[in-house]
């Protein structure tokens, strides 16, 4: 099967297969561990369809009558390894043994913790601990509450307030669309913010999450606009993000009325007080609407605290806030329930620093003040530097002026000075003097000698800060993230600059700055900071390019900062809100929050103490709120409601009597979720959504993605708690039915998981077995007296390539030969010609004389040309050869009488003459031309006569330069090397009876080459060129065969070998009822090396001359097999989840299934694994009278994987054949899939069968609401496809976290499963036809680029798909927003670069999306971060939805690919380096290219059982350890469930370790003393240069393709 992406203009792709890296690295140790217990093949990714693991559960398999009974070949004995390798493996074993305990840590995360507990003990555990409730429960409960009443949400920073706002906006807009469909007046929603910077941020977030027209306004953007402008804005948009003042002015001028607003969202609502615009909007306009029916239904506010400024929480103004906003506060009853999504603070500490010195001025500051101190522009800078010297230190104060008077800023200062003076007076003589003072100040700073930074020149506060940072960034920790909060922008800038000085740099710390969008005059940096700049800084912070940010209050609220583990309050907070919000940034596990307090400063101490007191008071205040203000979740007073509810169901397991009731179902489900595979740092939980429905409450439970069943819905009950239990109960029943809970209600999924995710159903390319091999086709077994014959003409397309006149050869057979594909023959000196095998119409009935003549010609060819004298009758010959009267260029297809084209004269002459009679004295000179002569004593010597030489006699010495004869007499017994002895090759005993005449004529001739394999183009010219010589004819035999017939018959062995191979392949196709094109049939069955199919390895035992092997067809067939089975499973099994779809598909397309089905029909016998053999092409069953005999090999050794690969190649051949039909179709390929998989889940024989078997589900055909119709209309305008069923489109964008009960639609997962395979096929089609000469490895790697998550995520943003996704997870909202910002920045940079380069060679087709159509480099996405998985998922789901909606029209998929994907890949050279971005490949380049090390290995071995773990668990959940070993030391290691991903993980870790390490440090650390040879050094230098192509390439950026063919 196709290899996963192994990670050219760039030579990076050559590292794997062609570069010196591949020659010097022990590839066996990388790809195939040689020690016992190590994996023989790298298993595949989870859900990698070809790498499915057999469950090994014999009971389960026996229960299913359709279960495959796999045949598994025993592994062959391991090949021998060198002593060096053996020592390395032994050392690796010792290392594993010594570190087994450490390696085993964390493995219990993948095993059910409670596996050994009884069910009763689980019950007792549950009684003593509450089930953790997902934060999403509270978010959705708050969302539901906000839909019915005005609400003030009081939630911690990072707990998802913005998500709730987005959900509410979407819900409001969807209701607005329904109202508009009813002809109700238009209304619009407003999202109001307090700060200008937040306008851009919140608009960017909402625009990423709402696929509706949104607009943003603030400040200068709406000055001097008219009423028409606002009317147009309100008509064209569904929502507006703006500062509150903007809306207030619009209401004041009556550009809009309050009854035209359907939603108000107040961001950070605690600002609603006094004359704040929030308060004025409510008091002046909202409250004035007396008719409650005309008021907007919801006025909602978001805040982290109802407390503002320094107000005592005990007298908090929540009643005032509630009354002013006409809303009710809503907060969580148990704040700790949000901790797993919010703050995870470990400790909060106070650090003291020495008292600051009194304010003073440095000498530079005083000198500058004397020059420009009176100028207004310098008043704020001087005010800052007056305090900077004492608070930061004199070095920072002087450094401020050095930065202030940078060269590019001086001109701006002069211009500002002029404007300032002119503003006071139209003309002033002081202008020149003041400008000169500015210039003088610049010269003064330029001439000042600045000292290097040192602790003596820094304040004690800065010194302590540096000490803290050094302690926090000690060692290598790539996950360390720190924010230092300061009060002033200049302080942030100067501290960042200080840490960038060489003397002050802290290893591992990369400083950055995050400040607001204002432009204070005191700042030395006058550049305006945009929201985009802020987001790009945050992205760098997230990626680790920056890990310590100096930030002002802008980082406290609003901006979505990545989770941190160090927060430092350099300047203490002024308000409780600042404290709560800045502390909320410390969300990583084990975070620390540091207050920097001045020694002996009671005010500082009081502030810190007051923080805790105020927070405690606030918490008590929230707890004291009335019950209707609290979000209780779904567990509130569960015991009471369960006792009260009588209508509870119960299930008893018949076999064991175990009972499942409502309360216990929560425990069972929690245990099951905990048993699912997950990273050690992640805690999986089930999500519960309880909605109010007629009659009470109904709950939907959603399980994590790794679960085989994703969701279930319970019954309606009067309480939330019982409704929740009902949903859990329904889910448990489904798990029991699916056998994911055992007879004791314990999870079995962990034990079954390897059966569905690892590589036990894959077969190995290393496991081989002997199989019978068909040498000859069945056609030749039809013997007997011929009554009628059919003919095939063997002609040359370019007969001049032979360099001798020739005529076609007729092959006469008892049955017609199928069409044989043309193929080339190679004649040396760059001469070649295609051979056409042309079936001649009709048949011929011959008399006995004619038959005997054909027998004579056939046997004469065998005897005279090939030195094989057979005794055979016409009944014994499988075919006959005959000369023809027609030429190579003749049209044999128009022959009407077959017997007329046979050269019967030549046939009769051959039949009547065994040899041409030769009279020594009576022959004319013409006799000695154009005859074919054979040596009866030496079968290797054949001659063409050129003519008589009257100037030579037999006793003349053989001239120099004539090729010497090979016979023994010439070398041993001949005393004279004359022409006579040259011509007589008989042995000594025979020579005694021969006395050739010495007066006979001498003839000039050509010695013909004996080479038969004309199929091989890798030959020397000398092997095929005739050599001149001089002979006498008396000891030789002149053949009766015509020379033009002989010239063509010399090619017959190669032709016959290819015909035999083609016929055997076609017989296999006929056996399977597949009418495949002949050349494709042969290609599909051709295996030309021992490791065909291993595209990334050097070929072993390559056999030339076999033509194209199966690899390209296998690449194509693999993808079609995936698509066909995917469509079939999607069609036939509509009620299963995506996970089960993957399982079912794995069972169909896994190599083990193909391998076993192939063996059942003996397909392996037809595989062509042997190149041309000069003794195997002769007919079988004939009696050989004279000539060498060789027993034919009738067996060949094939790897299990080879047989499976041939199955896929045959599917590929069927696909190409079907595409050539009129019209092009898939029918033949679909029949091939059905034959190969042989499964009830794929029984289709034509493409139309797929849709004929599809029954549209009820949700697809249900009536659409206005929201769904609006979405379909917008997508039609954007994408060009009009959906017949808009609900399909809606489903394609519904994330699994979005409750299905909202719109009664399933999530996109089933459609994504379908679209993934469809998009794969479209990509493979494009590459296969666009690059007909590309090898399968290249095709696989570049296909991975096209279908990678990284590209599809970019495409989702490019097409605007991200705005249409419906989800209920704040983490997804955050990820999408960050990724969209990054990808749009990369796109803009690409456009900017294109505008600077008019003749951009990467210009491609304009985008049809909503972005401007222009030319730019389409690889801008390569260097971006990984996208959130939902983005590539919705692209695939959209493709799947279009496919289903169009009644399975694949042309729609091709159109999507051509319009939206192909423009990015017109120049595939852009992605050569990306295609090779595989961790192991890249590590190989680093080790040899940069480190110059040759002694390293990547070793994989089974991890021994963990002490204390049950043996059964170990057997069912195998773990392997992979280590990068360098000179006997472990550089990096990883533990994984499969060898393949262990190697990837270990390589990533090794790359991380080597990042920033130079060759000298590496050699010292690992004792490397490798000395490379001259060629190796040159190759290493080349590799090192190539690695610079991706200078930022690091382990964090490595991506392995998620899709594609299984390995």
From Swiss-Prot:
Biological processes per GO annotation: defense response to virus; regulation of defense response to virus; siRNA processing
Disordered, as annotated region: 1-74
This protein's GO CC annotations: cytoplasm; nucleus
Residues that bind ATP: 155-162
UniProt keyword 4Fe-4S present: no
Site positions per UniProt: Important for activity: 1429
Function comment: Dicer-like endonuclease involved in cleaving double-stranded RNA in the RNA interference (RNAi) pathway. Produces 21 to 25 bp dsRNAs (siRNAs) which target the selective destruction of homologous RNAs leading to sequence-specific suppression of gene expression, called post-transcriptional gene silencing (PTGS). Part of a broad host defense response against viral infection and transposons.
Record-given protein name: Dicer-like protein 1
Species of origin: Chaetomium globosum (strain ATCC 6205 / CBS 148.51 / DSM 1962 / NBRC 6347 / NRRL 1970)
Protein's gene: DCL1
């Amino acid at each position: 099967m196709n290899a996963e992406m192994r990670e050219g203009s760039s030579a990076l792709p050559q590292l794997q297969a062609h570069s010196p890296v591949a020659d010097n690295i022990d590839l066996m140790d990388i790809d195939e561990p040689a020690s016992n217990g190590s994996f023989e093949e790298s298993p595949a990714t989870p859900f990698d369809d070809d790498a499915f693991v057999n469950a090994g559960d014999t009971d389960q398999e026996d229960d299913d009558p359709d279960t495959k009974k796999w045949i598994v070949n025993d592994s062959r004995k391991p090949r021998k390894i060198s002593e060096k390798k053996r020592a390395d493996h032994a050392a690796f074993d010792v290392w594993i043994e010594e570190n087994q305990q450490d390696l085993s840590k964390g493995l219990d995360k993948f095993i059910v913790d409670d596996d050994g507990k009884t069910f009763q003990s689980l019950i007792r555990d549950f009684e003593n601990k509450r089930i953790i409730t997902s934060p999403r429960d509270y978010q959705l409960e708050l969302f539901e509450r906000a839909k019915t009443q005005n609400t003030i949400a009081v939630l911690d920073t990072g707990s998802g307030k913005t998500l709730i706002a987005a959900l509410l906006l979407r819900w409001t807009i969807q209701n607005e669309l329904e109202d508009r469909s009813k002809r109700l007046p238009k209304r619009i929603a407003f999202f109001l913010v307090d700060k200008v910077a937040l306008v851009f941020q919140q608009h960017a977030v909402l625009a990423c999450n709402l696929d509706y027209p949104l607009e943003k306004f603030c400040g200068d953007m709406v000055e001097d606009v008219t009423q028409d402008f606002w009317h147009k804005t309100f008509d064209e948009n569904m929502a507006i993000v703006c500062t509150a003042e903007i809306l207030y002015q619009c209401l004041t001028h009556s550009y809009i009325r309050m009854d035209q607003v359907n939603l108000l969202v107040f961001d950070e609502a605690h600002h609603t007080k006094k004359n704040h615009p929030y308060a004025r909007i409510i008091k002046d306009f909202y409250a004035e609407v007396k008719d409650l029916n005309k008021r907007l239904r919801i006025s909602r506010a978001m805040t982290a605290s109802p407390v503002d400024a320094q107000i005592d929480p005990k007298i908090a103004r929540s009643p005032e806030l509630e009354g002013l906003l006409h809303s009710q506060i809503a907060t969580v009853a148990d704040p700790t329930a949000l901790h797993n999504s919010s703050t995870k603070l470990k400790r909060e500490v106070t650090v003291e620093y020495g008292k600051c010195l009194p304010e003073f001025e440095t000498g530079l500051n005083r000198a500058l003040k004397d020059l420009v101190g009176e100028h207004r522009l310098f008043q704020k800078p001087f005010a800052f530097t007056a305090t900077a010297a004492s608070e930061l230190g004199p070095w920072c104060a002087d450094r401020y002026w050095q930065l202030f008077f940078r060269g590019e800023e001086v001109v701006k200062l002069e211009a500002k000075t002029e404007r300032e003076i002119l503003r006071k007076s139209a003309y002033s003589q002081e202008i020149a003097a003041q400008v000169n003072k500015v210039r003088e100040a610049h010269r003064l700073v330029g001439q000042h000698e600045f000292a290097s930074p040192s602790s003596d020149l820094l304040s004690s506060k800065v010194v302590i800060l540096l000490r803290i940072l050094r302690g926090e960034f000690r060692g290598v920790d790539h996950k360390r993230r720190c924010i230092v909060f300061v009060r002033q922008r200049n302080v942030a800038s100067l501290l960042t600059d200080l840490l960038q000085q060489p003397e002050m740099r802290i290893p591992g710390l990369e400083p950055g700055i995050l400040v607001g969008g204002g432009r204070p005059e005191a700042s030395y940096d006058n550049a305006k900071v945009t929201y985009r700049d802020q987001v790009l800084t945050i992205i760098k912070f997230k990626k680790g390019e920056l890990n310590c940010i100096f930030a002002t209050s802008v980082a406290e609220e609003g901006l979505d900062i990545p989770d941190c583990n160090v927060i430092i309050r350099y300047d203490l907070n002024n308000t409780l809100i600042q404290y709560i919000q800045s502390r909320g940034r410390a969300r990583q596990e084990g975070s620390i929050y540091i207050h920097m307090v001045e020694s002996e400063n009671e005010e500082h101490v009081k502030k810190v103490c007051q923080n805790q007191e105020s927070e405690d008071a606030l918490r008590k205040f929230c707890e004291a709120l009335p019950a209707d203000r609290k979000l209780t979740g779904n567990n509130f007073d569960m015991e009471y409601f369960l006792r009260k509810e009588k209508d509870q169901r119960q299930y008893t397991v018949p076999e064991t009597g175990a009972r499942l009731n409502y309360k216990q179902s929560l425990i069972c489900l929690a245990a099951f979720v905990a048993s699912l595979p997950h990273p050690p740092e992640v805690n999986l939980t089930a999500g519960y959504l309880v909605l109010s429905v007629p009659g009470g409450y109904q709950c939907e439970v959603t399980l994590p993605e790794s679960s085989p069943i994703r969701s279930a819905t319970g019954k309606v009950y009067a309480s939330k708690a019982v409704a929740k239990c009902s949903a859990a109960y329904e889910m448990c029943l489904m798990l029991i039915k699916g056998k994911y809970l055992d007879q004791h209600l314990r999870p079995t999924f962990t034990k079954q998981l390897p059966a569905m995710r690892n590589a036990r159903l894959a077969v190995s390319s290393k496991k081989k077995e002997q199989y019978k091999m068909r040498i000859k086709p069945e056609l030749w077994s039809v013997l007997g007296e011929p009554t009628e014959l059919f003919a095939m003409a063997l002609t040359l397309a370019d007969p001049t390539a032979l360099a001798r006149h020739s005529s076609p050869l007729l092959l006469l057979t008892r049955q017609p030969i199928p069409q044989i594909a043309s193929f080339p023959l190679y004649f040396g000196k760059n001469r070649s010609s295609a051979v056409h095998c042309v079936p001649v119409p009709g048949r011929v009935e011959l008399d006995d004389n004619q038959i005997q003549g054909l027998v004579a010609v056939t046997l004469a060819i065998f005897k005279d040309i090939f030195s094989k004298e057979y005794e055979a009758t016409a009944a014994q010959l499988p075919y006959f050869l005959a000369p023809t009267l027609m030429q190579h260029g003749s049209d044999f297809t128009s022959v009407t009488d077959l017997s007329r084209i046979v050269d019967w004269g030549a046939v009769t002459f051959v039949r009547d003459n065994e040899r041409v009679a030769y009279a020594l004295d009576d022959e004319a000179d013409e006799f000695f031309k154009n005859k074919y002569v054979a040596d009866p004593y030496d079968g290797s010597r054949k001659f063409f006569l050129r003519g008589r030489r009257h100037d030579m006699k037999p006793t003349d010495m053989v001239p120099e330069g004539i090729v010497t004869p090979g016979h023994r007499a010439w070398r041993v017994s001949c005393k004279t090397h004359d022409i006579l002895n040259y011509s007589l090759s008989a042995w000594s005993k025979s020579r005694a009876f021969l006395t050739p005449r010495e007066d006979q004529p001498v003839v000039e001739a050509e010695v013909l080459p004996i080479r038969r394999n004309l199929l091989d183009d890798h030959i020397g010219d000398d092997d095929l060129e005739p050599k001149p010589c001089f002979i006498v004819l008396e000891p030789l035999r002149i053949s009766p065969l015509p020379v033009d017939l002989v010239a063509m018959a010399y090619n017959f062995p190669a032709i016959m070998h290819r015909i035999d191979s083609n016929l055997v392949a076609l017989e296999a196709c006929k056996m399977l009822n597949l009418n495949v094109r002949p050349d494709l049939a042969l290609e599909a069955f051709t295996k030309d090396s021992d490791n065909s199919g291993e595209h990334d390895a050097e070929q072993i035992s390559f056999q030339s001359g076999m033509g194209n092997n199966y690899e390209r067809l296998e690449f194509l067939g693999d993808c079609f097999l995936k698509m066909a089975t995917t469509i079939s499973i999607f069609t036939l099994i509509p009620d299963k989840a995506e996970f089960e779809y993957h399982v079912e598909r794995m069972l169909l397309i896994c190599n083990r299934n193909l391998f076993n089905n192939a063996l059942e029909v003996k397909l392996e016998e037809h595989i062509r694994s042997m190149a041309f053999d000069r003794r195997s092409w002769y007919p079988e069953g004939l009696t050989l009278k004279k000539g060498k005999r060789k027993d034919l090999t009738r067996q060949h050794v094939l790897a299990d994987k080879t047989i499976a690969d041939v199955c896929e190649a045959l599917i590929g051949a069927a696909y190409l054949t079907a595409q050539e039909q009129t019209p092009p179709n898939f029918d033949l390929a679909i029949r091939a899939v059905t034959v190969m998989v042989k499964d009830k889940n794929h029984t289709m024989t034509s493409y139309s069968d797929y849709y004929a078997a599809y029954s549209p589900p009820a949700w697809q055909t249900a009536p659409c609401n206005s929201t769904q119709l609006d979405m379909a209309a917008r997508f039609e305008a954007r994408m060009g496809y009009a959906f017949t069923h808009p609900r399909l489109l809606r489903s394609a964008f519904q994330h699994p976290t979005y409750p299905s009960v909202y719109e009664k639609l399933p999530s996109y997962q089933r459609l994504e499963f379908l679209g993934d395979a469809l998009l794969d096929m479209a990509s493979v089609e494009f590459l296969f036809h666009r690059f007909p000469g590309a090898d399968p490895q290249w095709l696989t790697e570049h296909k991975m680029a096209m279908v990678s998550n990284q590209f599809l995520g970019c495409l989702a943003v490019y097409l605007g798909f991200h705005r249409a996704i419906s989800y209920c997870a704040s983490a997804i909202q955050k990820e999408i927003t960050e990724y969209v910002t990054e990808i749009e920045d990369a796109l803009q940079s690409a456009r900017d670069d294109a505008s600077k380069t008019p003749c951009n060679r990467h210009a491609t087709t304009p985008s049809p999306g909503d972005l401007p159509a222009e030319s730019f480099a389409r690889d801008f996405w390569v260097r971006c971060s990984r996208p959130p998985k939902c983005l590539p998922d919705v692209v695939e789901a959209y493709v799947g939805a279009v496919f289903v909606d169009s009644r399975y029209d694949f042309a729609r998929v091709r159109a999507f690919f051509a319009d939206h994907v192909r423009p990015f890949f017109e120049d595939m050279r852009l992605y050569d380096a990306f295609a090779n971005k595989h961790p192991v490949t890249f590590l190989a380049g680093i080790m040899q290219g940069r480190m110059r090390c040759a002694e390293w290995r990547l070793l994989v071995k089974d991890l021994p059982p963990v002490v204390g773990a049950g043996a059964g668990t170990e057997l069912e959940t195998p773990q392997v350890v992979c280590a990068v070993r360098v000179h006997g030391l472990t550089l990096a290691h990883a533990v994984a469930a499969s060898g393949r991903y262990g190697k990837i993980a270990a390589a990533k870790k090794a790359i991380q370790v080597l990042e920033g390490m130079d060759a000298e440090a590496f050699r010292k650390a690992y004792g490397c003393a490798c000395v490379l040879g001259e060629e190796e050094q040159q190759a290493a230098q080349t590799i090192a240069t190539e690695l610079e192509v991706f200078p930022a390439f690091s382990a964090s950026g490595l991506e392995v393709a998620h899709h594609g063919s299984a390995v």
